[in-house]
Amino acid sequence: MSISIETLEGLQRRVTITVAADKIEAAYKEQLKGYAKNARVDGFRKGKVPHAIIEQRFGLAARQDVLSDEMQRAFFDAVIAEKINLAGRPTFTPNNYQPGQEFSFTATFEVFPEVELKGLENIEVEKPVVEITEADLDKMIDVLRKQQATWAESQAAAQAEDRVVIDFVGSVDGEEFEGGKATDFTLAMGQDRMIPGFEEGIVGHKAGEQFDIDVTFPEEYHAENLKGKAAKFAITLKKVENIVLPELTEEFVKKFGSAKTVEDLRAEIKKNMQRELKNAVTARVKNQVINGLIAQNEIEVPAAAVAEEVDVLRRQAVQRFGGKPEMAAQLPAELFEADAKRRVQVGLLLSTVIGTNELKVDEKRVEETIAEIASAYEQPAEVVAHYAKNRQLTENIRNVVLEEQAVEVVLAKAKVTEKATSFDEVMAQQAQG
């Protein structure tokens, strides 16, 4: 077998492979034997059909099978022999072939780029340094109290975090618009559910009052006919309610986890906050490292690899929204191409870090990661056992750990500055992605 490789545009390659005639003929004879064993021809018993008749009837199909199989086999032998870093499926083109002669064909394909990492020392990373304060804990406690809150009717003027019951009618240029009217609408204020200016216009008014609110719909508002439009809402304020938070008693505490005292609850909450904070800081640092890697190492990515990643993202999107699997192909590829390209870039760069530094998965760290995940559940031992039984779940954690190890290698060479940051700020940035 002879092999010649041409470099085409970008990452495209074309290989020409020639297979010896005797190898093709030997495979052809074996293929005919297979046909002969199962062929049914009138006048002959199964398996007893003369060779000449078998060849006459099935020779063309047998040769086509042989040539197709040989292209696959010879190509992947060439990939191994030439150490080709194949990306995606090849396109085969057979040359003219005559029985008894050697067989040649071409295969066009893409390869992954050869990546040589550079500029790691130029990557800048800002690492948040956070101390969870008593005030942070108090806020979390208040969140739990609000989940168990009750409401008491008030005759006082409405405040920013009150709950109100209103009737309203909205109009633009004096004309009511669709969806702008409601009766006995309950609004818990302070949650940014309404357009800017709406809740602020209610603050200061008492139950029984009627008044107008002037607002402007945001330019990004979902209804095309209302974007950027000035509107007036006629409001009837029917009821104002103040929030009543439960006292921090043992009875209240027992509603959350295994805590028995307020001190236990605070300790449990702090532990959860520390876990969330660690994950958020790790994710933020990793994102900066990856952004830096991409900025310092512009690499061309194979279109085939991007297309495969697009398909993965399509399927994930359909699954996330509960659609049928066949819907994935209907989603426009351009919706996912930027993310797909980035994922391929990240995969190539981190793989290069791993290979260059001969990194191996830290198995102890895998166990610690699984234990940390399990600690968030009521029965952590059962979660650990579930991972132990599920090879794919464990493999996912191993991949995450290996990526973290790669990020740490880059981080050790990068310019890292620490910045004092609040817990709320870090978590808000995490929520924004």
Curated annotation (Swiss-Prot):
Lineage of the species this protein comes from: Bacteria, Pseudomonadati, Pseudomonadota, Gammaproteobacteria, Pasteurellales
Primary residence: cytoplasm
Organism: Actinobacillus pleuropneumoniae serotype 5b (strain L20)
PPIase FKBP-type domain location: 161-246
Record keyword Nucleotide-binding present: no
GO CC, alphabetical: cytoplasm
Keywords: Cell cycle, Cell division, Chaperone, Cytoplasm, Isomerase, Rotamase
Broad enzyme group: isomerase
One BP term from GO: 'de novo' cotranslational protein folding
Highest taxon of source: Bacteria
Name this protein carries in UniProt: Trigger factor
